[in-house]
UniProtKB/Swiss-Prot annotation:
Protein name in the entry: ATP synthase subunit delta
Alphabetical UniProt keywords: ATP synthesis, Cell inner membrane, Cell membrane, CF(1), Hydrogen ion transport, Ion transport, Membrane, Transport
Family per record: Belongs to the ATPase delta chain family.
Keyword check for Membrane: yes
Gene: atpH
PROSITE patterns hit by this protein: ATPASE_DELTA (PS00389)
Source organism of this protein record: Paracoccus denitrificans (strain Pd 1222)
InterPro entries hit by this protein: ATP_synth_OSCP/delta_N_sf (IPR026015), ATPase_OSCP/d_CS (IPR020781), ATPase_OSCP/dsu (IPR000711)
Organism superkingdom: Bacteria
Membrane-topology annotation of the record: Peripheral membrane protein
Single GO molecular function: proton-transporting ATP synthase activity, rotational mechanism
Major place of residence: membrane
């Protein structure tokens, strides 16, 4: 099995659990609460090496994983639906898919709200006004509300790279210089 196949299988597994939880929560009208809880869970996962170890290490058995996510859910005040889904992931030895589970849930929630996320990499930090104008422009093109994930990469020299769904717009000076360099190689 290749790494790509393994990642695809993990995403597929996570997608099934995420879809089931999303359907359950959507029917009860708790999408906004779920969105907030998923953000909290993702932050906890990113901040805690112990939590990442718990989800990835084969040294923990089902009962230990289930007890740990149960305690975590209670401490974080997660909804019964999310807590039970996390316990089920642990019971079925699927906690390793937690990052894909969170990503899939975020996508489902964004689709339900008519939102799309744009990843923006710029050479300098964008001002709030620039972010608002960019979000408005992208919203006009996509017909959906746009949330920006902005980060800075000084190696771009200037400009930015915007990824919206499957589209990418690269207006960075670094890419323009690379194109110019390639064009000069063809001439000379």
């Amino acid at each position: 099995m290749t790494v790509a196949n393994s990642a695809s299988i993990s995403a597929d597994i996570a997608g099934r659990y995420a879809q089931a939880l999303f359907d359950l929560v959507r029917d009860s009208g708790g999408i906004d609460a779920l969105s907030s809880q998923i953000d909290d869970l993702a932050s906890a996962y990113d901040a805690s090496q112990d939590l990442r170890d718990l989800t990835l290490s084969p040294l923990y058995d089902r009962q230990q994983q289930e007890a740990a996510v149960g305690a975590l859910s209670e401490r974080m005040g997660l909804s019964a639906e999310l807590a039970n889904t996390l316990r089920l992931l642990a019971r079925n030895r699927r906690l390793f898919t937690l990052p894909q589970f969170v990503a899939k849930l975020r996508n489902l929630i964004a689709d339900a709200k008519g939102e799309v996320t744009a990843d923006v990499v710029s050479a300098q930090a964008l001002t709030d006004e620039q972010k608002a104008r960019l979000a408005d422009t992208l919203a006009a093109k996509s017909g959906k509300t746009v949330k920006l994930n902005a980060r800075v990469d000084e190696s771009l020299i200037g400009g930015m790279i915007v990824k919206l769904g499957s589209q990418m717009i690269d207006s960075s000076i670094r890419s323009k210089l690379a194109s110019l360099q390639n064009a000069m190689k063809e001439v000379g």
